[in-house]
């Protein structure tokens, strides 16, 4: 083999090449999000206002409280709280918060708001209106971590049957519709969608499944540990089966769209 070819390189070198694509997806998302946050600001996880008579008010939450966990899952951004509230479909949730340096937990039963079409607890978050570049970059990492977490939770819901495949899963047609809608609202909304899709694609591509980068990485890790090359026939068969399954899923999702 040519010494410069991919197959001639060491397993560790090939792993770094395989994972470079996903890494660049994350970099793209962070650059876009940092720019958006620096221009428009962002919402924090600290409470600014609590609506009277809402589940949050009944639970004793107060302005200034900082939400840190929802049902034990770490909160990176305020969207984690909204997603956590709605993923439970109205079931009671445990909110961990910090007040004056002390942490406490309350149990809240979200209320379904007909006009909004979703569950809410009745809180408004403080905003960072003129963040510094460093604050914007830090928040972009938080947002990226949040998107990674939400993507994994979404995949888990699909595989466990918790997600509604008719309404919660979309394919190319859905993405095109979302892109068109975001573009109509404004270029920055479209860029935010690009960042979200970039992270989602990176996470999906890193799954340890044949034909995906994650599947290749697993094979190369096996070669690295055993110091033996996995036979090309086995690799080819795995990738063919994986590719066919992915194409099948894509066709089904597109038909559903």
Residues covered by each model-derived region:
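Terminal peptide-recognition signature
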Residues: 21, 56, 64-67, 71, ...
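PDZ-domain C-terminal substructure recognizer with occasional recognition of PDZ-binding tails
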Residues: 58, 62, 68-69, 80-125
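Internal alpha-helical transmembrane segments
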Residues: 1-49, 239-248
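Pore domain of cation channels
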Residues: 18-27, 192-206
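PDZ/PDZ-like domain segments forming the peptide/carboxylate-binding groove
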Residues: 30, 34-69, 73-76, 130, ...
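Functional transmembrane alpha-helices
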Residues: 3-12, 110-203, 218-241
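Juxtamembrane/interfacial segments flanking transmembrane helices
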Residues: 43, 168, 207-220
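Juxtamembrane boundary at the C-terminal end of a transmembrane helix
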Residues: 252-257
């Amino acid at each position: 083999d040519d010494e410069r070819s991919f197959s001639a390189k060491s397993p560790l070198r090939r792993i770094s090449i395989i994972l470079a694509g996903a890494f660049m997806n994350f970099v793209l998302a962070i650059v876009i999000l940092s720019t958006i946050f620096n221009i428009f600001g962002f919402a924090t996880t600290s409470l600014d206002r609590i609506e009277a008579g809402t589940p949050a008010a009944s639970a004793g939450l107060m302005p200034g409280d900082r939400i840190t966990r929802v049902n034990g899952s770490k909160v990176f951004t305020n969207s984690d709280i909204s997603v956590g509230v709605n993923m439970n479909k109205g079931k009671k949730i445990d909110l961990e918060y910090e007040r004056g340096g002390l942490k406490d937990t309350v149990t809240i039963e979200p209320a379904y708001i007909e006009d909004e079409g979703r569950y809410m607890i009745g809180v408004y978050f403080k905003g960072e209106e003129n963040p510094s570049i460093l604050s914007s970059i830090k928040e972009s990492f938080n947002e990226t971590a949040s998107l990674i977490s939400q993507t994994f939770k979404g995949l888990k819901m699909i595989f466990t049957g918790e997600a509604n495949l008719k309404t919660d899963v979309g394919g190319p047609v859905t993405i095109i519709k979302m892109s068109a809608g975001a573009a109509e609202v404004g270029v920055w909304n479209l860029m935010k969608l690009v960042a979200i899709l970039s992270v989602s694609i990176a996470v999906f591509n890193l799954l340890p499944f044949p034909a995906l980068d994650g599947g290749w990485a697993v094979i190369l890790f096996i070669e690295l540990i055993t110091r033996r090359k996995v036979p090309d026939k086995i690799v080819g068969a795995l990738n063919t089966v994986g590719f066919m399954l992915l194409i099948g899923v894509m066709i089904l999702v597109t038909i559903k769209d």
